[in-house]
Amino acid sequence: AIQQGFDYVPEWDTFLVSAYQKSGPSVIYAVKEGKTVRKVILKNEDGSDFTSHVGGIAHYGAYLYVTDKGGLRLFPLSDFVEDGKAESGSGGFLNTYNNPAFVYIDAQTHYLYTGTFYRAGNYETPESERIKTPGGDENTSVIHVFDITRACNGREMKAEIPVAAYSAPGLVQGMTMTEGSIVLSTSWGLSPSHLYFYPRALQELYSVPEKTYRIGETEVPLYYLESSILQKTVKAPPMAEELVYQDGKILIMNESASDKYIFGKLTRGKYVYGYEVKE
């Protein structure tokens, strides 16, 4: 299996890691105290194998949100943190009006962020996501922001309510937030990964956005993650995926620690790395 998504459930002191397989269903691993304590196979609502790339996962309330084509699949969170479950069936779908590569949920604001992955030639994004920022950057992806408290109610999907859009650079694999920063992870192949830090208070920088962006049928404010407001850049090991911010550290999941990329098992790529944030 090839690791992708990364989440932490503090109530259970458990990390969740999503992974896809070359042949077979996608899976979620539960990791506690440095050890894998369970492996759960993902299933569609009809009982067939769920074979998404599972590039991102995040939990909120009773559900784990997993990236899929066109939106997010919902799975009961209890299936992954309680003993006895070997399979988990999808319990709903949230349309995010994009093909999400990652997902992040801010527990403080109850906002859900889901963005696309761009790489020229093989991972193209829609023309609407190619945006020249006020600072002159040529951004190539967009992060859609939703008020998750209005987007769903248990298993009953209500109308998705987008509230904002963030123009972002290419190669983004994951996102998290610290007390003062929005942090994006970017990576491709064996090149070094990077963590990009931007101010969290974008609404203050762009208090009256000059442009809006259409998500579904809704026009929302458009903000920019661009070099003119970049706080800092941190180099990280190759193949960085999703991020978790915990106890003052950004934890980085690495795709290299898999059978597909054997070098990660033979080198230090098999570890989750932590970057201490000083704000």
Model-derived segments and their meaning:
Residues 41-49, 92-96, 163-168, 231-235:
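Surface loop/turn motifs at the tips and blade-to-blade linkers of beta-strand repeat domains
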